[in-house]
Each structure stands twice: as C-alpha cells, then as structure tokens.
Amino acid sequence: MGMPKVAALSRKRILVVDDEPFVCDAVKMMLNFDGHTVETAHNAKEALAMFEEGKFDLVITDFAMPAMKGDELAAAIKARAPNQPVVMITAYAEMLQSSGNPLKGVDFIISKPFLLENLREAIAKVSPSESREKDE
C-alpha cells in the first residue's frame, strides 16, 4: 500500500529547457508519464524568466543552446537559488566529464540519447533523500 504514497511524494514540478521543441516535447511526455508537472522553455532567457516566476523542484537543461549554454544557465540559476537541482542533458557528456572541469551549477549529467529510466535516475540522485530512505 505504500507504493502510491511514495509515488505521490516524488512528483515534481520540472522546468525543461532545450532549443529543440521536439526534445522538450519528448522529455515532457516521459516525465508526465510518471506524474510530474512539466513546463518547457526553448532558450535560457525564457527559462530564467519562468524560473523567476515559479518554484521548480528541478531544472533539466540541454547543454548546446544558442546565446547561453546549459552550464551558463545552471550557474545563473544557482546564483539565484543555490540549492536548486539542475540536470543537464547532452550529447557531449563524455567530453564534458573527461575535461576535468566540473560544470558549475550542474548536479547530474544525462547522455543523449536517453530513456525515461535515465531521467528517473537523475531525479532520484538530485532529489532530497526522504522518499528514497523509505524504500531502503
């Protein structure tokens, strides 16, 4: 009987940022499947405006975007809310991780292509541990 309660606890309000609308739509569809509320932005400027207006449990951003890259967006978000979890989705994950320069403001990196399971893992890793401890 505890399963629905854990699922309800873990529902998040998530901001997804990607300059490719189809990627935003795909991520939104996957996250909606798990009961999360998702809003999308197609660039960093739009994302920052939305972030200022609303409280999000998590921000998921692409790395390679015009004007402001995902790590720059993450740093700008952390400057406003230091504890805000930020996950980055990128085709450049291995290159970025092996560069030796940690990405400021990024809590977790997902490699493209990705599956719903990768999103679930990222959400679990960056979320406060209260709901995970009950499972263990």
Placement of each model-derived feature along the sequence:
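Two-component/phosphorelay signaling modules centered on CheY-like receiver
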Residues: 21-39
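Conserved phosphotransfer cores of two-component systems
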Residues: 52-54, 76-84, 101-104
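Non-catalytic signal-transmission and effector/linker regions of two-component phosphorelay proteins
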Residues: 1-13, 117-136
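Receiver (REC) domain active-site loop signature in two-component systems and cognate sites
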Residues: 65
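Alpha4 helix (beta4-alpha4-beta5 surface) of REC/receiver domains from two-component response regulators
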Residues: 72, 93-110, 116-117, 121-124
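Acidic catalytic/metal-coordinating carboxylates
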Residues: 42-46, 69-73
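Active-site beta3 strand of CheY-like receiver
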Residues: 54-60
